[in-house]
Structure formats: structure tokens, C-alpha cells
Amino acid sequence: AGNPYFIDLETLIEEGLLTKEECDSVDFGSNPAYVDYEKIYMGRFELLEKAFHRFVPDQAYETFVEKNKKWLEDYSLYMAIKNSLGGIAWSEWEAPLKTRQEAALEEKRVELKEQMDFICFQQYEFAKQWEKLKQYANEKGIQIIGDIPIYVAFDSADAWANPELFQFDENSTPL
């Protein structure tokens, strides 16, 4: 999944999802010697939420969601549940959620649908902007390379959604 911190707010202005005034009015911190990450997080997500509420899903969005369904459904559900529980690790969730009991998951899909849609919107915007940046760089003869982590974080959508691929004990603790 793409990190929403890297979604360019100016692009969201160009898309008509935000205004310059809205972006300028957010306090991201004024001390250049100190980075207030909480302030940045809160301000950025306040703006992303405004953009989301103005966003009208189109065919390109629907295609993105369908094309990425395999990971996006689990990721958006995982993040929505995690956010609704104050960020605690999935291994601390109540058993029906921790062990992915379908009735509990379906209840959360209904309850957290808007939050899941917001997360899908973020991933869509990130992917669009990433592709545009990559194309621009490639046209200038610049190849962008990256690395892929050789491990999966324990507290991740991947570990939660695919426990059969990991060695966990009966309490969902890594062995």
C-alpha cells in the first residue's frame, strides 16, 4: 500500500478536490527547527478527508478498486478496524476480529464502510500520482528503482489477512 503522506495536496487542488485556501489554512507547524508529526498527520488527514467527501467515483476509480481487489479489500478493512480501535495491534483485537470470523468481519464492513472507502480513495490517489511521477521521470530518462522489504511486519494487513503463511501460536503470537 502507498503511504498517504506522499499524496500531493497541490494535485488534489488541481483536481478540484481541495482549495488552495483550505490547504493554506492548515497549521502544519511554523518552527522550521522542529517537526510536529502529530500536527502534520492531523492536518494532512483533515484535508484528505475533505477531498474524499468531494470525490465522485468514476470508471477509473472503479477499475482501480477492481484491479487491486485482492489486497485492497483486506487492507482497507484492516486499517479501518485498526483506526476504529485506536491503533492497537491486530493481535490485541477481540477474538472474532483477530481470527477473521466472517460474521464479525461482515459487521465491520458495514459499520466501517465509509472509512474503508476513504482508505481506498487514498490508495487510488497515491497510485495515480505515483504513476504520473514515474512516467514523467521515465520520459526524462530517469529510471526509478526501489527496494522491497524482505519481511512482513507482524502488525500488518498482510499478517492479519494471511495467518496461514506465518508461524503463529494459538494466541496469534509469532513463534
Where are these regions (language model features)?
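Acidic/aromatic-lined carbohydrate-recognition and catalytic surfaces
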Residues: 1-163, 167-168
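Short, intrinsically disordered, charge-balanced linker/junction segments flanking boundaries
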Residues: 171-175
